[in-house]
């Protein structure tokens, strides 16, 4: 019997597979209601901000040959309503499922406020800190591109909450290792990586970008080699747990990410092609591990053999 159980700070996972933040909303989107979320290792909810946020102009999503461009934005009803309605309903439906909430904001104070409220709710097991949000005080530059800002933000949130926190790293940086080290110095309990790569596509007939917001985040197959490279680099400088993401659509992908250094994974864009992608990956994983003669998935973490 292959062991796929993974134990991370705050998250006791029966298997290492969860949906990427935003994929299943707050458990209220159609895809999330087509199967039992208890089949997954955990549920990660959509990024939550202090106040209700509307999304970006339409179109918000462009399906490409090898990935997805999205500029959906952090559409959510605000933290108070997320707790009183969305999370309360999700937790009632799934009393034993590990739930990770995703925290966003325009300022450090925003992040701390949302983190404190989510932590105090008692409805979630861990927090993912989405540092890809634009920092209004810094002219709109993403929080996650500056090591000093990441360290300080992580420290402030860590001091304010008792829950484990996972800092979600943006790949839109020169050196992701430096940012990962900053998150660890700030007291992060784990790292999620990678968020989407900033991209743009243009319709040559209309000469307009495909997205209403012009630019958006690229995810899916196209970013997989970048995600694997970055996870491998970060694994060499930290022992922190890593939740890996970026183009995972098969059980083989899960194994590849774990060999690179991830402890668990999140599946996002694959759900555009297969609404049950995460469920199917969970079902296929034990057989794929058996083929490789692996008895415990945890034994594979960071075991890539470099040339």
Swiss-Prot record:
Molecular function, one GO term: dihydroorotate dehydrogenase (fumarate) activity
Cofactor(s) required for function per UniProt: FMN
Keywords of this entry: Cytoplasm, Flavoprotein, FMN, Oxidoreductase, Pyrimidine biosynthesis
Record bears the keyword Flavoprotein: yes
Main location: cytoplasm
SUPFAM superfamilies found in the cross-reference section: FMN-linked oxidoreductases
A single Gene Ontology CC term: cytoplasm
GO BP terms: 'de novo' pyrimidine nucleobase biosynthetic process; 'de novo' UMP biosynthetic process
Residues annotated as binding substrate: 46, 70-74, 130, 195-196
Binding-site list for FMN: 21, 46-47, 130, 168, 194, 220, 246-247, 268-269
Protein's UniProt keywords contain Cytoplasm: yes
Organism superkingdom: Bacteria
Annotated cofactor note: Binds 1 FMN per subunit.
Cited NCBIfam families: PRK07259.1, pyrD_sub1_fam
Protein name: Dihydroorotate dehydrogenase A (fumarate)
């Amino acid at each position: 019997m292959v062991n796929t159980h993974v134990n991370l700070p705050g998250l006791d996972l029966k298997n290492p597979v969860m949906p990427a933040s935003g994929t299943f909303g707050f458990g209220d989107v159609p895809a999330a209601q087509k199967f039992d979320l208890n089949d997954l290792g955990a549920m990660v909810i959509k990024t939550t901000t202090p106040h209700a946020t509307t999304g970006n102009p339409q179109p918000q999503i462009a399906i490409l040959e090898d990935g997805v461009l999205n500029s959906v934005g952090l559409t959510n009803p605000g933290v108070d309503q997320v707790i009183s309605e969305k999370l309360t309903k999700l937790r009632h439906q799934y009393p034993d499922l590990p739930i990770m909430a995703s925290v966003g904001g325009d300022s450090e104070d925003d992040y701390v406020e949302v983190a404190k409220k989510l932590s105090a709710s008692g409805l979630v097991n861990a927090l993912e800190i989405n540092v890809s949000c634009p920092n209004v005080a810094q002219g709109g530059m993403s929080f996650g591109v500056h090591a000093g800002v990441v360290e300080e933000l992580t420290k402030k949130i860590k001091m304010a909450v008792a829950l484990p926190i996972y800092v979600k790293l943006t790949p839109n940086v020169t050196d992701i290792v430096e940012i990962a080290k900053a998150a660890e110095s700030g007291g992060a309990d784990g790292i999620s990586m990678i968020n989407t790569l900033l991209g743009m596509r243009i319709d040559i007939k209309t000469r307009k970008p495909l997205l209403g917001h012009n630019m958006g985040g690229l995810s899916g197959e196209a970013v997989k080699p970048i995600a694997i490279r970055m996870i491998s680099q970060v694994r060499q400088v930290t022992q922190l747990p890593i939740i890996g993401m970026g183009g995972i659509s098969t059980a083989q992908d899960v194994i590849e990410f774990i060999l690179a250094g991830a402890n668990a994974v999140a599946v996002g864009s694959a759900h555009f092609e297969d609404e049950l992608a995460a469920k199917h990956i969970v079902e296929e994983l034990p057989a794929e591990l058996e083929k490789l003669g692996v008895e415990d998935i945890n034994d594979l973490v960071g075991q890539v053999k470099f040339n």
